[in-house]
Regions:
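TPR/Sel1-like alpha-solenoid repeat signature
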Residues: 4, 95, 102, 114, ...
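Residue at a conserved register position within TPR or TPR-like alpha-solenoid repeats
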Residues: 5, 33-36, 64-65, 102, ...
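Alpha-helical repeat scaffolds
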Residues: 9-22, 39-53, 71-85, 108-122, ...
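"A position-specific structural signal for the A-helix of alpha-solenoid helical repeats
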Residues: 28-31, 59-60, 97, 130-134, ...
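Structural signature of alpha-solenoid helical repeat junctions
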Residues: 53, 90, 123, 171, ...
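Short coil/turn linkers that connect adjacent helices within long alpha-helical scaffolds
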Residues: 84-86, 122-125, 169-170, 209-212, ...
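Alpha-helical adaptor scaffolds
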Residues: 222-300
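Terminal, low-structured helical/coil segments at or just beyond the last alpha-helical repeat
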Residues: 325-361
Length: 361
């Protein structure tokens, strides 16, 4: 209910909920203060966050990034958890969050550097996998040299050495499958369709554990859909993704105390589905996916800007200028400082927005 009230910007309802929750976490109490712009109250909350030795600062940062789309404030909050007096797992989580926040800004170069910093921190494990997931995001312009390096890095990963966070359970049993999936999608990014298909074949042939059959199937289908969509085969990609319906065991959603990304959360499949629907001009269906498909995901902030851009383009194609302008405005703000390869999209969006808000002249 809190999440719904926040998404609807019903902060009176949020206040009412918090009044009934005597020990509400800092992150839940902080968000309405930031939303209202109360500078004095904001300073008090920042002081409280500074003195905590918990993950509340980075959880607050995620809320501020997701619900308020204020990436600068989110960064400031997350950096509080980098203080030397914080415990190593908290510092590592904050560093990884900052890497994903850079991706949300369209800044692969800064995100890549942040991942490198995380790799050198105490207790770091699995950072290579997180960075590989980041590099596969379809809307980013990742240099091929970086993708090639990351593919080699993933190829060298020992799938049986997942570190303490994945030392047992279903996630550990699926690490070999995740590795092959990432190798397939990274190969697709490089235009190496033969290798991408080969890795997908290996993934399908790999035995699975417990109740993870649908997870393995969906990883392989997503990899194949990625290849199809990159080759302009939207109908084929959509058909491949039809069985991918979120059959993810609860254990895989909650095996980490605090996650910056869910390795098996199917966000990539959802984004590919939305892209395929746009290509097929199934605009109503596409809009539904862009609006809601990433809600609740730890990586939701990363999908905000590309989601706004696609919604703007769809509304523009349908002649709905007011809605298109609103989404272009959000997109331009979120990616205004993106990496150079993405700036042409930002410039084009800014020009379209100017025409829409200037009476079409």
């Amino acid at each position: 209910m809190w999440d719904l009230a926040v998404r609807e910007e019903d902060y009176s309802a949020v206040d009412a909920m918090l009044s009934r929750y005597a020990r509400a976490p800092l992150s839940m109490r902080l968000l309405p203060v930031f939303a209202r712009g109360d500078s004095a109250a904001r300073a008090r909350f920042i002081e409280e966050a500074t003195n905590l030795d918990s993950r509340q600062s980075q959880i607050s940062a995620r809320y501020v990034a997701t619900f308020l789309e204020d990436f600068a404030a989110a960064e400031s909050l997350a950096r509080l958890d980098l203080a030397e007096r914080r415990r190593p797992p908290i510092r590592l989580g904050a560093q990884l969050f900052l890497a994903w926040l850079e991706l949300a800004r369209g800044r692969w170069s800064a995100a890549n550097a942040a991942f490198e910093t995380a790799k050198r921190m105490e207790g770091a494990s699995g950072v290579e996998i997180e960075r590989a997931i980041a590099a596969t995001m379809p809307f980013l312009e990742v240099p091929k040299a970086d993708i090639g390096h990351i593919r080699l890095e993933v190829a060298r990963v020992n799938p049986n050495d997942g570190g303490p966070a994945a030392s047992s359970g279903l996630a550990a049993g699926l690490r070999p499958h995740l590795r092959l999936y990432l190798l397939s999608v990274l190969s697709s990014r490089l235009g190496d369709d033969q290798a991408a298909a080969r890795y997908a074949d290996e993934l399908e042939a790999l035995p699975t554990v417990d109740n993870a059959g649908p997870v393995k199937r969906d990883l392989a289908l997503t990899a194949r859909a990625d290849i199809a969509l990159r080759n302009g085969k939207a109908a084929e990609a959509l058909a491949l993704l039809q069985p991918v319906q979120g059959e993810v065991p609860l254990e895989l959603a909650y095996y980490k105390v605090f996650a910056t990304v869910r390795e098996f959360g199917q966000e990539h499949a959802r984004y590919l589905r939305a892209e395929a629907l746009v290509s097929l001009r199934r605009y109503d269906d596409a809009l539904r996916w862009y609006r809601t498909a990433f809600q609740g995901s730890p990586a939701e902030p990363v999908y905000l800007a590309p989601g706004h851009l696609r919604q703007a383009q769809v509304y523009e194609a349908r002649g709905e200028r007011e809605q298109a302008a609103a989404h272009y405005r959000h997109f331009v703000e979120l990616w205004k400082d993106s990496d150079p390869p993405l700036r042409a999209m930002v410039t084009e969006a800014r020009e379209k927005l100017a025409r829409m808000t200037d009476g079409g002249r």
